[in-house]
Amino acid sequence: MIRLYRPQRPPLRAPLRATPSLSLRWRVMLLAMSMVAMVVVLMAFAVYAVISAALYSDIDNQLQSRAQLLIASGSLAADPGKAIEGTAYSDVNAMLVNPGHAIYTAQQPGQTLPVGSPEKAVIHGELFMSRRTAGDQRILAVHLQNGTSLLISKSLKPTEAVMNKLRWVLLIVGGVGVAVAAVAGGMVTRAGLRPVARLTEAAERVARTDDLRPIPVFGSDELARLTESFNLMLRALAESRERQARLVTDAGHELRTPLTSLRTNVELLMASMEPGAPRLPEQEMVELRADVLAQIEELSTLVGDLVDLTRDDAGQVVHEPVDMSDVIDRSLERVRRRRNDIHFDVDVTPWQMYGDAAGLSRAVLNLLDNAAKWSPPGGHVGVTMRQLDPSHVELVVSDHGPGIPPQERRLVFERFYRSTSARAMPGSGLGLAIVKKVVLNHGGMLRVEDTVPGGQPPGTSFYVLLPGRSLPPAGHSTPAGESETDQAEAATDPAVPVAGDTANSRESANVISVDSQSARAR
């Protein structure tokens, strides 16, 4: 019998619990308390050590002064008993030891002068002087020249009482200081984090109500700059939502018209095919089918344009080296297939730039389609690309159509905008909007002029300024050490001179620049 064994899976780990964290206000307040507490403790230790050393040093000085006074007075040699008894009226204990003869003592009530090893060493002449603390007394022992030894001690109880009071004072003052630091830290933190609270409230308000009102900015500190950045984000979000709403509204309006017409035609075709229904003439059937196909193509074009716009807005763009000459050639092939009655006069300089190949191809194709659409049968469309300087080239697409009225030029490249004369022509109203978006995204500029100023018809010319670098002639090898990728990356300089910096950037009533939010109504 064959047994099947299933591999045992390792036991699943329980998910880690989110550890509760303190709020920023509490963390700042605790940090302030900790810093103040550390400083208070260090200062308390320093004060305690300094005062303690000073008090004990003062006791040593007092004992030293008493011993020197007794020795200098000569009373220890003349009448040692009386001299020692005289110290009983002070606050010290005294003892005079004469080895082999006598010991004189005078002690305070309830106190006994302790004699230990250091004092015995002084008495035996092994040490000249000793100081030490024994119990609650400070002892000084001095060996005199006549062989006697003087021992003096003083009680440390008054000093210890002072030190105990000092400890309590430092403890109370330190505690009060930490408490004051906590309160002050809380107040400062609350005032300092008020802009953060406003930002939090604004973010929650946006999430709840989609209210994108800016937040008031106070001061010029880091939090004020953070608030300004947040307001900038709110403005960008508001503009994005406005563009999105406008795009949806315009797209719905533009889609409704061909869909309604398509639905009507399809219903008419279906009704004519029902049993017993009168048959439409063959010519009308052909026209209806042609209308349906044209409307489907119009819908496909509109959807494709919308996809291109949303693709750019979503940032789904891959940048790579792009040969603009090749882009223009491929676009011309497509336009020639649709308008084989148009003559294209082409003069293109080899040029390479780093960007979105699909977007650039769509922009060039839209310009050529636009020029071909407005050119009369047998007309000429000019396509030239000439180098202006080592890092810029100008692409010019010109036609000899009816031209654009000056009052409509500022509407060029607006989404879904179509002039009165253009509404009868095929198109979605998005082609030039895509051109504008692609050109600006690649650091370029665009302007519109009459092909023949004052002519009848004046025609229209689009001037597109693009960054990049020239390509070597065909058959010319790339210099050693420089790859094609290096050449392409050198063409990414986004710095583009203003229209007046080029020889063809004339400022006149017939020139509309993209930078001035112009638009072409076609």
From Swiss-Prot:
Main subcellular localisation: membrane
Keyword Ion transport: no
UniProt keyword annotation of Magnesium present: yes
Residue(s) carrying Phosphohistidine: 253
Function: Member of the two-component regulatory system MprB/MprA which contributes to maintaining a balance among several systems involved in stress resistance and is required for establishment and maintenance of persistent infection in the host. In response to environmental signals MprB acts both as a membrane-associated protein kinase that undergoes autophosphorylation and subsequently transfers the phosphate to MprA, and a protein phosphatase that dephosphorylates phospho-MprA.
Stretches assigned to the Extracellular side: 52-167
Membrane topology per record: Multi-pass membrane protein
Alphabetized InterPro entries for the sequence: 2C_sensor_his_kinase, HAMP_dom, HATPase_C_sf, His_kinase_dom, HisK_dim/P_dom, HisK_dim/P_sf, Sig_transdc_His_kin-like_C
Cell compartments where the protein resides: Cell membrane
Residue ranges annotated for the Histidine kinase domain, each copy included: 250-470
Membrane-spanning parts: 31-51, 168-188
GO MF, one example: ATP binding
Annotated GO CC locations: plasma membrane
Reactions mediated catalytically: ATP + protein L-histidine = ADP + protein N-phospho-L-histidine
EC number(s) stated in the UniProt entry for this protein: 2.7.13.3, 3.1.3.-
Post-translational modification: Autophosphorylated.
Keywords on record: ATP-binding, Cell membrane, Hydrolase, Kinase, Magnesium, Manganese, Membrane, Nucleotide-binding, Phosphoprotein, Protein phosphatase, Stress response, Transferase, Transmembrane, Transmembrane helix, Two-component regulatory system, Virulence
UniProt biased composition (Polar residues): 502-522
Topology Cytoplasmic: residue spans: 1-30, 189-522
Domain HAMP: 190-242
Residue ranges of the region described as Disordered: 467-522
Name listed for the protein in its UniProt record: Signal transduction histidine-protein kinase/phosphatase MprB
Naturally occurring in which organism (per UniProt): Mycolicibacterium paratuberculosis (strain ATCC BAA-968 / K-10) (Mycobacterium paratuberculosis)
